[in-house]
A protein has these predicted regions:
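Collagenous Gly-X-Y triple-helix signature in extracellular proteins
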Residues: 36-271
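Secretory-pathway extracellular proteins and peptide precursors enriched for disulfide-bonded cysteines
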Residues: 28-31, 257-259
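Short, intrinsically disordered, low-complexity terminal segments
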Residues: 7-8, 40
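Heptad-repeat coiled-coil/leucine-zipper oligomerization helices
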Residues: 5, 12-15, 19-22, 26, ...
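A recurrent domain-boundary module in secreted/ectodomain proteins
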Residues: 26-27, 271
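Exposed, low-complexity/repetitive linear segments and helix-based recognition motifs
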Residues: 9-14, 22, 115-118, 250
């Protein structure tokens, strides 16, 4: 038998075995509190809290399996917020995706996207938000948005690209404008409000606080793969300013920077 075929079969059998093991755990857990099938009340008439399902380890699952659980509506039951999965870019860089919330984002048809991920690290290279010192047009017209969704996305492994769903985002159009724009992309950069839960330097109204960042003692700062602390972009144009975008300083504090400066990029995506 061809070695590649053998390896593929072995991997498939391994996935099947893990799925069966998990299903056995679910059945065992649910059997601990038998309930009436119609009203969910136990035969003895007492009300019990349904047991929490055991969680699957994200890194043990393929992207196809993760997407399957997402589409089944069970993602928040079988995976844990904060769990991570590694993936390798086409240049050999290993990155880590973290679950930052469930059922938080939507697509342009207003369908709920079950899982939102964000990279734990920033990309190796730094990027300008725009080649010019302006924020006019906001994230919608930014160079970084084009780079992420034309170049960086092509560096993702094919199995990950296949399951990513375009996500709808509302963002200020910058340039001292009070207007907002809508974008729908596979990859995006988080807004100030999605990270800090409020407007600090931004216009506000750009999404809602992600569950991961809402937790106490969450680290807001990020590092590159070599451990170097990195200043990173947010997609939010700075309020009352035509030149700056918001960002997160290497210490984790809210900050801002000129649009033509080169800074780190941590991106989000939905499955």
């Amino acid at each position: 038998m061809d070695k590649n075929v053998f390896s593929q079969l072995a991997a498939e059998f391994d996935r099947m075995e893990r799925t069966i093991t998990y299903q056995k755990e679910v059945i065992s857990t649910m059997q601990k509190t038998p309930t009436c099938p119609c009203c969910k009340v136990p035969a003895d008439g007492r009300i019990y809290t349904l047991p929490e399902l055991p969680k699957m380890k994200l890194d043990d699952c393929s992207w196809a399996e993760i997407a399957m659980y997402a589409q089944s509506g069970m993602a928040d039951k079988v995976f844990a917020q904060g769990d991570t999965k590694k993936f390798t870019l086409s240049d050999g860089t290993v990155m880590t995706a973290r679950i930052i919330d469930f059922n938080h984002d939507t697509d342009k048809e207003n369908n709920i996207l079950p899982i939102t991920f964000e990279t734990v690290e920033t990309l190796n290279d730094d990027f300008q938000m725009n080649p010019e010192y302006i924020n006019k047009g906001g994230w919608q017209n930014s160079q970084l948005r084009k780079v992420l969704n034309n170049s960086v996305i092509e560096m993702l492994p094919a199995d990950l690209r296949k399951v990513i769903k375009p996500c709808l985002k509302k963002t200020s159009l910058g340039g001292n404008s009070e207007k907002y724009g809508l974008t729908s992309d596979p990859l995006f950069v988080l807004s100030e409000q999605e990270i800090f839960g409020r407007k600090i330097y931004s216009h506000g109204g750009e999404g809602h606080w992600y569950g991961w960042y809402r937790q106490e003692n969450t680290e807001y700062g990020k590092c590159k793969q070599n451990g170097e602390q990195d200043w990173r972009w947010e997609r939010s144009p700075c309020s009352g300013n035509a030149n700056y975008f918001c960002g997160v300083y290497s210490s984790g504090d809210a900050n801002r920077n000129g649009a033509n400066n080169s800074c780190g990029v941590s991106f989000g995506f939905c499955v």
